[in-house]
Amino acid sequence: MKQIPIEYQVSPYMVFFLIITIQMGVGMLGFERISAKLVGNDAWISTLLFGISVNVMIWIIYQILNQGNGDIIAINQNVLGKWIGGLLNFIFLSYIVLLGATTLHTYIEVVHVWMFPSISSWVIAGAFLGLCYYIVTGGFRVVAGIGFFGIVIPSILIFTFFYPLQYADFRNLFPIAQHSFLEIMKGMKGNMFSFFGFEMLLLYYPFIKKARTSQKYAHYANLVTTIVYTYLMILTLAFFSEKQLANAIWAYLSMIKIIQFPFIERFEYIIVSVWAFFILPNVSFTLWGVSRGIKEALGIKQKYVLPVIILFIFILSFFLNNRNKINLLNTWTGQIGFVYIYVYLPVLWLIQTAKIKLRR
């Protein structure tokens, strides 16, 4: 593929912010209940192990990208041929569309439940997608800049991670490791959607200056995410009883309801509003990634592809009008992502490595 001009690239350290931004999305608000439902008070172990597995996958992704010296679109076709590679590119780009749609519509559900139950989904979707269109048309550097501020601005809420500690009962965590390893592995499923998004590296790798040197920042970013998610899981398990957590769909928001100020009665309104700074770069990244991927695969300019993708996600807002449908979308997205990332990418790496060795 063509070398990206340096004026369109970002510094290697920006990968740290790009990965954290897309990992700490809407899943962070309620991932605890799903894992706890599967493995109870050992859910924090599942979260920790899944975070470690993501670091392994980041290493594999960098092996693929460094050897292929391009993005996943070009690498798939170079390694597997035009048709098989093209099919796998279609699957990956479809998954990225679903990832963006799931993130946006799950956040819309949060807004409905916690703030504005009567507002139409299409109104919120239209406002977000309009902003995302403006951001994405500015190019990758603008998207990356929004991703940076998507970490900096919400960081003012970090104190909410510690306020509930005074009400935590850490005896809820015992006995530790009462579930089998297989059960804990199954519990990792509850963390998939929260951690996913790091695979966007497969698309924006060519836009990083001295991309090979950015790997350490990717690992650091996932380390931070893993620590945050594991801590939140431990805090949630200590704050809620098992029965209470089973009914807490948005566990994090339920916890911070206890925070009150003389001038703010419903502090969770602030949380949901500020969380938009996480969601905006999340959706923008996916829109940029899909439009860029289609440009590389089919030669269609991004400015023509982008409105079509946005229209598709907008139309979904008329159909994703209840919890069951959004849950189903979450499940499909997680399963497709798991198979592509944890099954296909290692196989691709092995085939690619074997081909390189045979050529030598």
Curated annotation (Swiss-Prot):
BP GO terms, sorted: spore germination
Membrane topology term: Multi-pass membrane protein
Keyword Transmembrane belongs to the record: yes
Keywords (A to Z) from UniProt: Germination, Membrane, Transmembrane, Transmembrane helix, Transport
Broad class of where this protein is predominantly found: membrane
Keyword Transport: yes
InterPro entries recorded: Spore_GerAB (IPR004761)
Gene Ontology cellular-component annotations: membrane
PANTHER family, sorted: SPORE GERMINATION PROTEIN A2
Function: Required for the germination response to inosine. Has no role in L-alanine germination.
Family under the similarity heading: Belongs to the amino acid-polyamine-organocation (APC) superfamily. Spore germination protein (SGP) (TC 2.A.3.9) family.
Name this polypeptide is given: Spore germination protein GerQB
Species this chain originates from: Bacillus cereus
Gene this protein is translated from: gerQB
